[in-house]
Amino acid sequence: MATPKAKVSKSRRDKRRAQFTARSKAAVTTICPNCGEPTLSHRACRHCGQYRGRVVTKKSANG
């Protein structure tokens, strides 16, 4: 196993770890082929309730 050449200070270690949360995780959206609304990828459409051509969630009359 490799050994470190020098001690990594707490400050340097914490700065490195902070970069993981600093990066924004942008939501990937696609256009629903059924209703045309933007929807999250690999999720059922919130407007029409379809995913990959099938109705997976029933929408009530109230919304």
From Swiss-Prot:
UniProt-listed GO biological process terms: translation
UniProt GO cellular component terms: large ribosomal subunit
Comp. bias intervals (Basic residues): 7-18
Keywords: Ribonucleoprotein, Ribosomal protein
GO molecular function: structural constituent of ribosome
Family: Belongs to the bacterial ribosomal protein bL32 family.
PANTHER family, sorted: 50S RIBOSOMAL PROTEIN L32, LARGE RIBOSOMAL SUBUNIT PROTEIN BL32
NCBIfam families to which the protein is assigned, alphabetical: rpmF_bact (TIGR01031)
Name of the protein in its database record: Large ribosomal subunit protein bL32
Source lineage: Bacteria, Pseudomonadati, Chlorobiota, Chlorobiia, Chlorobiales
